[in-house]
Amino acid sequence: MNAVYLDNNATTRVDPAAVSAMLPFFTEQFGNASSMHAFGAEVGGALHTARRQLQALLGAEFDHEIVYTAGGTESDNTAILSALETQAGRNEIVTSAVEHPAVLALCAWLEKTRGTRVHYIGVDARGRLDIDAYRRALSPRTAIASIMWANNETGTIFPVETLAAVAHEAGALFHTDAVQAVGKIPMNLRHSEIDMLSLSGHKLHAPKGIGALYVRRGVRLRPLIRGGHQERGRRAGTENVPGIIGLGVAAELARHHIDEENTRVRALRDRLEQGLLERIGNAWVTGDTENRLPNTANVAFEFIEGEAILLLMNKAGIAASSGSACTSGSLEPSHVLRAMHVPYTAAHGAIRFSFSRENTDADVDRVLDVMPGIIAKLREMSPFWDGAAAAKSGFAPTYA
């Protein structure tokens, strides 16, 4: 039995082409790019090529608008903390209630330790941002608005260009966590109002431990990590050369295949959703089904726990993720689904299936074969499930 991996929003397999490109930089071209000798110059040239590859994927105007980091979390932290330092007289942040913890945890820390005021903008039942509330929250005191490009759990896409323009009307900077969007949504940042953008290599078939922060030319950036002069003095530390090379190759592959792969992956995702809803009652798709990432399906199965579903899926050789998280011994639904007002009976049983270019029709077939039995087995054990009553109820979620 072949394993089925449908957790690509968590991480992706490194593309073999990226691995091949990286290998020489471990044992042959191992110089420090800051060194004056030939070993350093050789590495420096390779880094320049990789930077241009990422620039092309982002549609950035200048390659020096890219600052390499260790990943999305560092990029998010750098952008927000820098804005608070460079935007004189401004000490407020506007963000959404459904951001990644890389943003939300930082905001909570800033509230507690620095007295920063943070406005958390809500979403509707489909995960769409309340634009009017966003506009009202912005003021001359706002240093930065940070809104993700696409949600990691539901795939819902946010209108970041509109949000950036509105932020600028208030004199604030605009940052977007685009970790889930880069490589899945075509970008043209040279014609964008986005000031800063975070990305992470391991979400697009590059290695873990490498990411980047796009900083639009003219936007001041205070480094989070201080030391040497690397990245034009904006991020100290010897460059992760193999990681940067791998990210460059992955970016090049994504740019060349984004349209065809989006079409193919969307078809797989849609077939999975349709098949699950046809085979399993009291289940539905969460998020904005008309405006979301092509690879992401978040399906809520009512009256059972996501953790239990995942355990049985894992035994069947299928990897996905749950909308629930176990924290300090108490099971709580995802903060994203709570913000969307998904009923607890469904939010606890939400499963995210996230595809990549490596997935096939056979993967979908396997999930459709296995999932009905898993859900039926768990519902039989659930004290909240009355199959006969549910079948007669004609249940449909009123919040969708």
From Swiss-Prot:
Q: Which UniProt keywords apply?
A: Iron, Iron-sulfur, Metal-binding, Nitrogen fixation, Pyridoxal phosphate, Transferase
Q: Name the coenzymes or cofactors required.
A: pyridoxal 5'-phosphate
- Residues that the record marks as modified (N6-(pyridoxal phosphate)lysine) are K203
Nucleotide-binding among the record's keywords?
no
UniProt-listed Enzyme Commission number(s): 2.8.1.7
- Recorded GO MF terms: cysteine desulfurase activity; iron-sulfur cluster binding; metal ion binding; pyridoxal phosphate binding
Write the protein's name.
Cysteine desulfurase
Tell me what gene encodes this. Answer: nifS
